Amino acid sequence: MISISEFQVKDVVNVSNGKKLGSIGDIDINVTTGKIQAIILGGNGKVLGFFGKEEELVIPWRNIVKIGEDVILVRLSEPHA
């Protein structure tokens, strides 16, 4: 089992292109099933949206390839990364 705080300190990397996407800022949980639906990244600080807030990137749980000691590997198509 892993705690949310342990989950949040891991870097998220796209295995499709090797790019570091950032770290987890939040998670989306289905309250009916109690399962994680998606992880939400706060962005890498390069893209600022409205009022200077970082853009969020929502990654569905099914796109997670592997959760390792220091990194979470995800598979995303190029437009997302």
UniProtKB/Swiss-Prot annotation:
GO BP terms: sporulation resulting in formation of a cellular spore
InterPro entries per the UniProt record, alphabetical: PRC-brl_dom, PRC_barrel-like_sf, Spore_YlmC/YmxH
Induction: Expression is regulated by the sporulation transcription factor sigma E.
Gene ablation phenotype (knockout): Inactivation of the gene does not affect sporulation, but a ylmC/ymxH double mutant shows a 100-fold reduction in the efficiency of sporulation.
Classification via SUPFAM superfamilies: PRC-barrel domain
Pfam families in the record: PRC
Keywords: Sporulation
Family per similarity comment: Belongs to the YlmC/YmxH family.
Name by which UniProt lists this protein: Probable sporulation protein YlmC
Species, as recorded: Bacillus subtilis (strain 168)
Gene assigned in the entry: ylmC
